[in-house]
Swiss-Prot record:
Has an inhibitory effect on SARS-CoV-2 in Vero E6 cells (IC(50)=4 ug/ml). Viral replication is inhibited by 80% at a concentration of 20 ug/ml, and 50% inhibition is observed at concentrations of 5 ug/ml and 10 ug/ml. This is Mannose-specific lectin. Keywords: Antiviral protein, Disulfide bond, Lectin, Mannose-binding, Plant defense, Secreted, Signal. GO terms for molecular function: D-mannose binding; protein homodimerization activity. The lineage of its organism: Eukaryota, Viridiplantae, Streptophyta, Embryophyta, Tracheophyta. The gene is LECASAL. It comes from Allium sativum. Disulfide bonds join 59-83.
Amino acid sequence: MGRTTSSPKAMMRIATVAAILTILASTCMARNVLTNGEGLYAGQSLDVEQYKFIMQDDCNLVLYEYSTPIWASNTGVTGKNGCRAVMQRDGNFVVYDVNGRPVWASNSVRGNGNYILVLQKDRNVVIYGSDIWSTGTYRRSVGGAVVMAMNGTVDGGSVIGPVVVNQNVTAAIRKVGTGAA
């Protein structure tokens, strides 16, 4: 068999897909994620533990901790049932009124790509997506997940072997072409 090689760009795509799958796998019991093109219509919500991110019937997008509102889009209009909030393919999260006009946006347009909006257990709502550009020299942890740099390292160490990617999931990243963990 021929030797398999992989570019840093391909490895980054694999790492991005693995991170997204990890986030999605940890949400099997509760719906707390929107992916490209998905949205919340009046009465629908994302939920995790005591937090609820809901598109209300009045067109106001609100984040609740238990029954206390802690953030709102301030787009509420009495009697305007039919609004929706959409995670767009360009990275922007937008609230549209009943006539399809944008009334609020996250202003996070980054170009077409793979984006997810996550209601996290730390009461934060975050949009994650493809990096636009990177030197590949960073090392950081995001929301309890290990982030792999383009050079194949995490916190200065090799990622070959078991890597804890969040509090509940362990993943083994394999070197391409060897079959070994």
